[in-house]
Amino acid sequence: MNELPGSYKLKIKKAATGSIQFSRYLLTRMTHDRVNVNAGYLAYITLLSIVPMLTVLLSILSSFSVFADVGLVIQNFVITNFVPASGDAVHGALLEFVANTGKMTAVGSVFLFIAALMLISNIDKNLNYIWRVTEKRRAVLSFSMYWMVLTLGPILIGASIAATSYVTSLNLLQNEVVSSAFNTVIRKLPLITSFFAFFGLYLLVPNKKIHFSHAAAGSLVAALLFELSKKGFAAYITQFPSYQLIYGALAAIPILFVWVYLCWLIVLVGAEVTAALGEQEQWSDSQEMVHSSDKDKITEQGNNSDSTDPESK
């Protein structure tokens, strides 16, 4: 067997060394940023805000006659593809909560909208902390961005679902080749949707310029972790259903709690990957870093941005 040329060996060695240094730097960075703690914090905020968010989304969709039935389609799609196993129980609980909000007064509806804005605001603060962003957006700009997410987001989602339904109804799909390709895309749709959702989050939320390649890499990691966690979590709660023996009819609640926590952990891990890729000078081979200097540099960065730590507010 022919040996690899020296130049290829050098490239392979350099790539392996770079991967090890990057992984070490990433783990140190994640430990310093306490991604597990922040994931729990965001999960708590999400659980308080999930019903207001769903209510606002469905209310906006229902105000457009063309999207009259899209809200139900979106709910079914999300539960089927993004909530592992026991989706029916979680779906039923959420629908019951949302239905109860219909009995609220105008003042209560305003507070629901504020709760939804708070969730988006906390996501913004946590992600900007990961990127060590110290310069805050102006209040007017932040509010405009949050308002756009709450209003245009549901409309764009509804338009996407409506367009998919229209394409599905076309005679073009009767062609075997086209139909097979379309079905393949549909099967991969959860992964594709996750990737672009993470990509938009990592590219647009931080108040600094993010390279497309870095955001794409972090999004790919997060999307793959999300798909793996869905399968792993589903296997666990179906093969080891001890939670049902303990919680009985309330089993859907801890399932939702744990799943939301895992989701945010994955979001933050993907964000850390994206941010770390943009700090190549901190972990590249040319710096000949050692583990202790990793900690020192990350700690120094963190201290410079402690004022933006979402938990300190």
Swiss-Prot record:
Membrane-crossing segments per the record: 41-61, 104-124, 139-159, 185-205, 217-237, 249-269
GO cellular-component term (any): plasma membrane
Composition skew (Polar residues), residue ranges: 281-290
Its membrane topology: Multi-pass membrane protein
Localization annotation: Cell inner membrane
Keywords for this protein: Cell inner membrane, Cell membrane, Membrane, Transmembrane, Transmembrane helix
Location of the region described as Disordered in the Swiss-Prot/TrEMBL record: 281-313
One Pfam short name: Virul_fac_BrkB
Similarity remark: Belongs to the UPF0761 family.
PANTHER family per UniProt: INNER MEMBRANE PROTEIN YHJD, UPF0761 MEMBRANE PROTEIN YIHY
Protein name: UPF0761 membrane protein VS_0126
Source organism of this protein record: Vibrio atlanticus (strain LGP32) (Vibrio splendidus (strain Mel32))
Phylogenetic lineage: Bacteria, Pseudomonadati, Pseudomonadota, Gammaproteobacteria, Vibrionales
